[in-house]
């Protein structure tokens, strides 16, 4: 059954011809989209010179367009977003309440103040809008400017915000952008693009946006498109397989900016057990880090290291904290977290095995597939910790922080930490092991766009940093004067 159609948005045109079917990631439904092999030659710019119209725009005009776009992205009145939402109910594992909320939070992203903060903090408005002068020690004059590039985005499909951020970053940098829509969020980027065309028809920003779907690995499309004379950068949010797949096309002139899959962790200090009120507050914060978007994100808490100690009192505290976290987790509002629609059956089998092995683990909840907390009764995570999902987390009591740092590596993205004093103690150490973001417990999934991501600054990386040098022979010693007489 064809559940919905994913059009091709081609620089202001909406194309629904030459449709072919594709499978969704969940269920038996299919969707249809134009056969991209018929349109791949039309996706890239004919010439890089065609980007010059973007540089005729003042940043105030860019802000005007984005603000109008944000105002138009009102879920209750925007038919494009409503269509994207209906498709997401078929394509995505998240429940309706969460998917709808992911659309309702879009308008503030495009506000003037927010866009200005992102652009200035992550690139610098002076570099985006003109040539910034510097004088070097040898006397040469440099003028540096951040130019946009021809970018292909392969965004993740875990919520509408990713598609919105992708478009926002591209517009800020004055880039020409092609977006490969994810199969589990197929229409959000299309909906935003169509809304942009409604509020700014024939505008340069609209004419430098392409959104479409093709199956990853389609050689008829990718071998034609993924070339330096078509695109200069690929921003890939995908899973390990898709990121590895993209690397086959990387060559001089074509750069990969990988926002690759990560795991996150939590560290809770002894102060959490000072009194019942503190423990309850810590439990509420930890439950939020676990439960947001049903633990589908890279930033969600999964393994929670607790500096409770492993003696009898320490284990009792860890078990009590586990009970409180479970209670708070199952009480989160539906726009934040619900029992998962498609729990991992293999993980559920592991849970039941742990439940029967109560000398080593205490399992709290999980009988109704609503989520669970597994409290290790030793200082090791469960051996299935990479599988933790669907609101299942593992509390690991430890005696010292050394046990925690040993578990941090290059795959560690976010670490939520309580209390703040412990975070300050660890902030110069954890990055050495691979941690990329340290945040207050409870804010792991409350991510700021105006900040680095995955230990890089992706918006700066999307830019080409161009240097104009001026060397006066009377100031900068010319090489020809170094020749022997």
Name every feature range the model reports, one short phrase each.
Residues 176-180, 235, 257-258, 416:
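Short hydrophobic alpha-helical runs that function as membrane-insertion/retention elements
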Residues 115-199:
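Conserved small-residue-rich beta-alpha loop and adjacent elements
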Residues 6-9, 441-446, 454, 483-484:
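Terminal end segments
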Residues 292-413, 424-430, 442-470, 474:
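NAD(P)-dependent aldehyde/semialdehyde dehydrogenase
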Residues 173-178, 204-205, 225-232, 408-413:
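Short, surface-exposed connector motifs at secondary-structure boundaries
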Residues 135-152, 215-225, 374-385:
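Donor nucleotide-activated moiety binding/catalytic core segment of transferases
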Residues 1-143:
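N-terminal Rossmann-like NAD(P)+-binding subdomain of aldehyde/semialdehyde dehydrogenases
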Residues 200-303, 308-310, 451-484:
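Conserved NAD(P)+-binding/catalytic subdomain of aldehyde/semialdehyde dehydrogenases
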């Amino acid at each position: 059954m064809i559940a919905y159609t994913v059009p091709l948005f081609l620089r202001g045109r909406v194309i629904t011809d030459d449709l072919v079917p594709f499978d969704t990631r969940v269920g038996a439904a299919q969707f249809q989209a134009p056969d991209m092999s018929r349109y791949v030659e039309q996706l890239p710019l004919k010439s890089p010179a065609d980007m010059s119209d973007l540089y005729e725009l003042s940043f105030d005009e860019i802000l005007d367009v984005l603000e109008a776009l944000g105002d138009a992205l009102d879920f209750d009145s925007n038919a494009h977003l409503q269509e994207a939402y209906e498709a997401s109910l078929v394509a995505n594992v998240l429940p309706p309440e969460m998917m709808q909320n992911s659309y309702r939070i879009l308008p503030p992203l495009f506000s003037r103040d927010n866009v200005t903060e992102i652009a200035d903090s992550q690139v610098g408005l002076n570099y985006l809008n003109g040539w910034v002068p510097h004088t070097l020690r040898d006397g040469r004059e440099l003028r540096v400017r951040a130019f946009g590039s021809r970018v292909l985005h392969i965004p993740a499909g875990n919520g509408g915000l990713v598609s919105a951020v992708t478009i926002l970053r591209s517009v800020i940098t004055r880039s020409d952008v092609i977006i490969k829509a994810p199969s589990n969020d197929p229409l959000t980027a299309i909906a935003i693009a169509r809304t942009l065309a409604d509020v700014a028809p024939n505008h340069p920003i609209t004419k430098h946006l392409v959104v479409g779907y093709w199956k990853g690995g389609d050689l008829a499309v990718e071998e034609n498109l993924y070339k330096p004379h078509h695109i200069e950068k690929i921003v890939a949010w995908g899973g390990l397989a898709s990121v590895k797949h993209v690397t086959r096309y990387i060559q001089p002139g074509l750069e990969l900016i990988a926002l690759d899959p990560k795991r996150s962790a939590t560290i809770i200090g002894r102060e959490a057990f000072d009194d019942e009120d503190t423990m309850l507050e810590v439990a509420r914060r930890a439950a939020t880090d676990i439960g947001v978007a049903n633990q589908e994100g890279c930033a969600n808490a999964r393994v929670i290291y607790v500096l409770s100690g492993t003696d009898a009192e320490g284990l009792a505290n860890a078990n009590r904290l586990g009970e409180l976290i479970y209670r708070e987790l199952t009480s989160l509002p539906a726009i934040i977290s619900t029992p998962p629609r498609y729990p991992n059956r293999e993980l559920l089998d592991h849970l039941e095995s742990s439940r029967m092995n109560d000398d080593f683990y205490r399992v709290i909840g999980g009988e109704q597939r609503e989520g669970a907390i597994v409290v290790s009764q030793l200082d090791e995570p469960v051996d299935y910790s990479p599988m933790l999902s669907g609101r299942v987390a593992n509390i690991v009591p430890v005696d010292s922080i050394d046990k925690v740092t040993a578990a941090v590596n290059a795959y560690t993205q976010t670490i939520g930490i309580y209390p703040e004093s412990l975070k300050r103690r660890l902030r110069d150490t954890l990055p050495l092991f691979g941690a990329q973001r340290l945040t207050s417990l409870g804010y792991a999934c409350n991510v700021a766009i105006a900040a680095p991501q995955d230990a890089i600054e992706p918006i700066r990386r999307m830019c080409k940093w161009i240097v104009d040098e001026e060397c006066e022979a009377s100031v900068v010693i010319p090489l020809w004067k170094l020749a022997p007489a």
